[in-house]
């Protein structure tokens, strides 16, 4: 791999990280990573009707109620963030 290839790959990665929130970066904490994964999962469940209907049947709820519950869970999917240590 040449230096120009590495530069091109890094610039593409930086572009993706700026464009999409869930792609992460070097300073991403474990909590932020987990939040991105959970939100991505909930968005996928809401966006795919068969999965949404599966959850609705499994939990004996209406599809609208399941959609609402998933959207509410997207607000704080992993609970409150941990307190940061001040340096």
Swiss-Prot record:
It comes from the Eukaryota. It holds the Pfam family SF3b10. GO terms for biological process: mRNA splicing, via spliceosome. Belongs to the SF3B5 family. PANTHER family: SPLICING FACTOR 3B SUBUNIT 5, SPLICING FACTOR SUBUNIT. This is Uncharacterized protein At4g14342.
